[in-house]
């Protein structure tokens, strides 16, 4: 359930002042006047020629590219920036580029000033996406949130519900969805070029740079003066600071902070599959993977999903298989009309249809086979659109997003169900999407939602 008032959004963390709480409640009350409006109506509150004011939570890494990407739109103003790291790779660089923006270390204090801006960019590590984004939507803010949408399946469902309840404009940061390559592949499927799709194989075969399949480091290191380590940990279990293992990038290898290789790349590579076939939620899945270390993600896995059939698939169900490991690719005999001399991309998807197969490389032009039936120079090509401008213009009532949370939520739920399956290899998990329940495996069900750190438990979890 989402909270009836903003009190439940405030982590019970010491140091959050009484005045700050009053400001938050006042802001929430003001935001409540717009909650019943749809996105286009809400944008008109600002006026026909209004500008979009944005705040960014997370300004390093993808936060930097998201912030500069959105701010490149001529009708966007950067009002506030927030990061737990004040170095020039994070808040310092953003402050230098946007000197008029208010600066924060604590996202909760930024939201105290919610009356100053209309939209929030969320580019924290995975485990903080939902706490920040849900609080922002509750205050009436549009949200652009990096992928994967959330850290748990339950959070992904709450994000969908909140976006619908509050009528916010939302977009997940799977930017490649807007690239010509992915849009073209989706168009080919929708045009019936290869007929009904019988099966799908998706894979990620490159080596990540973060730690995998290893024990958590022991001991602790001095916390740098420019890093607010407790704020970085947020809702995650409290851990000692270790140089080079968590912040700023290697958090991606640890279960408490990330969603592993499947969560990180699945929202990109499976995206054109979902979009082309109009998939929703799987009904069952089985994973193959080595036993996990207690804290880190595996270095290889295969997940077999089964989805209900759609208008673009053959039969009552459609199998989709995910593979990740260095150098991995799907079995050639399963890929239909693709000739043996064709070198599969390092990462991507193959959709096997009645009349041919489509290869969708990760960020490269798709190919259709057999090539004699699909001459490349005669195939339609869709243009690239700007994923960031699309969201900004949708907030102003001038466009619609293509990766709103009503779409990104089920996609994220799917990849996160796969990460649960990886915990229980060779065991089929049966999924009831409506009930948000793994019906045949009580231990696996416990991972659908995870507890928050003591003192950081919002009521909607």
Q: What do these predicted ranges mean?
A:
Residues 10-32:
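N-terminal secretory signal peptides and thylakoid transit peptides that target proteins
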Residues 69, 77-82, 86-97, 265, ...:
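Glycine-enriched catalytic-core subsegment of oxygenase/oxidase enzymes
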Residues 109-115:
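Short amphipathic alpha-helix with an adjacent loop that forms part of the alpha/beta core around
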Residues 58-62, 66, 166-172, 176-287, ...:
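Predominantly a Rossmann-like dinucleotide-binding segment in NAD(P)-dependent oxidoreductases
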Residues 130-178, 192, 426:
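Beta-strand-loop-alpha-helix segment that lines the small-molecule cofactor/substrate pocket
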Residues 120-121:
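N-terminal Rossmann-like NAD(P) cofactor-binding module of classical short-chain dehydrogenase/reductase
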Residues 102-106:
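Conserved SAM-binding strand-loop segment of SAM-dependent methyltransferases
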Residues 27-98, 176-179, 185, 273:
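N-terminal Rossmann-like dinucleotide-binding module
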């Amino acid at each position: 359930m989402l909270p009836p008032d903003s009190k439940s959004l405030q982590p019970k963390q010491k140091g959050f002042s009484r005045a700050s709480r009053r400001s938050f409640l006042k802001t929430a009350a003001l935001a409540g006047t717009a909650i019943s409006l749809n996105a286009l109506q809400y944008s008109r509150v600002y006026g026909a020629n209004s500008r979009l004011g944005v705040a960014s939570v997370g300004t390093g890494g993808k936060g930097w590219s998201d912030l500069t990407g959105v701010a490149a739109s001529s009708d966007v103003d950067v009002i506030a920036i927030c990061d737990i790291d004040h170095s020039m790779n994070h808040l310092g660089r953003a402050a230098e580029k946007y000197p008029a923006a208010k600066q924060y270390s604590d996202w909760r204090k930024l939201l105290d000033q919610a009356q100053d801006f209309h939209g929030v960019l969320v580019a924290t590590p995975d485990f903080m996406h939902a706490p920040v984004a849900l609080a922002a939507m509750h205050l009436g803010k549009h949200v652009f949130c990096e992928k994967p949408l959330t850290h748990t399946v339950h959070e992904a469902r709450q994000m969908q519900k909140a976006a619908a309840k509050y009528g916010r404009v939302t977009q997940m940061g799977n930017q490649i969805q807007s690239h010509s390559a992915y849009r073209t592949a989706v168009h080919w499927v929708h045009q019936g070029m290869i007929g009904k799709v019988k099966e799908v194989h998706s894979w990620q075969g490159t080596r990540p740079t973060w730690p995998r399949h290893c024990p958590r480091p022991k001991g602790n290191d001095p916390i740098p003066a420019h890093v607010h380590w407790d704020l970085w940990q947020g809702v995650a279990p409290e851990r000692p600071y270790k140089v080079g293992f968590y912040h700023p990038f290697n958090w991606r290898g640890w279960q408490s902070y990330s969603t592993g290789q499947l969560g990180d790349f699945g929202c990109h590579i499976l995206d054109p599959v979902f979009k082309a076939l109009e998939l929703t939620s799987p009904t069952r899945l089985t994973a193959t993977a080595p036993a996990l270390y207690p804290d880190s993600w595996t270095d290889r896995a295969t997940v077999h999903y089964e989805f209900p059939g759609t208008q673009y698939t053959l039969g009552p169900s459609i199998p989709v298989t995910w593979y990740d490991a260095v150098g991995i690719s799907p079995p050639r005999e399963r890929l239909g009309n693709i000739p043996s001399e064709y070198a599969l991309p390092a990462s991507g998807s193959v959709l096997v249809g009645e009349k041919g197969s489509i290869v969708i490389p990760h960020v490269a032009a798709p190919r259709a086979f057999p090539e004699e039936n699909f001459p490349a120079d005669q195939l339609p090509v869709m243009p690239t659109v700007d994923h960031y401008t699309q969201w900004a213009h949708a907030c102003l009532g001038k466009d619609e997003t293509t990766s709103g949370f009503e779409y990104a939520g089920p996609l994220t739920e799917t990849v996160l169900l796969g990460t649960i399956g990886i915990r229980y290899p060779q065991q089929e998990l049966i999924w009831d999407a409506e009930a948000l329940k793994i019906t045949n495996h009580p231990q696996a069900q416990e991972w659908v939602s995870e507890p928050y750190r003591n003192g950081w438990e919002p009521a909607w979890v």
